[in-house]
């Protein structure tokens, strides 16, 4: 699990994720991103994949509920693995660990992928882990 010591490295990782988007997205507000990372570390779940003491991937999220229910679920804020580590087991280990933490807390998992492209491959990846696709997201593009 990530600790406050990891905030700077996570910022750099998530900035790389942001730069890989296939659609136009809003620019990063550094203070807001640092605040979100800290919130996830202190009140949620932030897991790291490391190779030789270097972070190569992360998944982070919070417990929340749907607007119509009190039932809690564990939802990701981000899930990203560096391109050079995508053929490793980093992604599957991160997601399986995230699911396990949610299950141990009696929460269902909600994961998404938006803006990053390669949608079919990612849908299949999540499907192999027992997750079911639940819709789509539509947005205006500038």
Identify the residue ranges that each predicted region occupies.
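A short helix-loop-beta-strand connector motif used in the catalytic cores of GNAT acetyltransferases and
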Residues: 36-48
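Conserved beta-strand in the GNAT
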Residues: 48, 54-64
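Conserved beta-strand-loop-alpha-helix junction that forms the acyl-donor binding cleft
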Residues: 110-121, 141-142
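A short, internal acetyl-CoA/4′-phosphopantetheine-binding micro-motif in the GNAT/acyltransferase core
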Residues: 77-88
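A short beta-loop-alpha structural element at the N-terminal edge
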Residues: 1-12
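A conserved beta-turn-beta hairpin within the catalytic core of GNAT-like acetyltransferases
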Residues: 65-76, 134
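Conserved acetyl-CoA-binding loop-helix of GNAT-fold acetyltransferases
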Residues: 87-100
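Conserved GNAT-fold acetyl-CoA-binding loop/helix
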Residues: 15-36
